[in-house]
Amino acid sequence: MTRVHVPIHLRWADLDAYDHVNNVEVLRLLEEARVRAFWRGEDDGVDAGLALIDASAGASTMTLIARQEVEYLLPISYGRRPLDVQVWLGRLGGSSFEACYELRSPAGVEPAALYARASTTIVLVDAATGRPRRITEDERAAWAEYVEEPVAFSRRG
């Protein structure tokens, strides 16, 4: 299956007093990767295969986050090269889907590091009614190539 690779630059402000990226900032980095992967916009060099959702003002579909989970594996130090956030779909439901992520060291860096893995359940909502809307057959067909096993969290307790 296919994963979308989204390069995400760290900001100096992402660091906390322990000189690594703060856990809340990791969620913001994942949000940035999610927006670039799923919402239609300008061509920024990211595979647009997942980008089917119109996020412009007045769009007919809104998205709501129903659930998020992050497993932090290694501290992330500041670096100038963008991290490689790999995004795929772990599940396609009726009106929701699970976006999965691996937050990795910059492409080409050896040894490669896996800093975090995460998942987000996203619900598609009809903007006019405020009610969940079904994933269309066109969306389902386009997204099928990006579906693989969901994140296997190892530190549940």
Language-model segments: what does each one mean?
Residues 1, 77-81, 88-157:
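HotDog/MaoC-like acyl-thioester-processing domains
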Residues 1-65, 127-157:
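Hot-dog-fold acyl-thioester-processing enzymes
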Residues 37-97, 113-115:
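Hydrophobic beta-strand-centered segment that forms part of the acyl-chain substrate-binding groove
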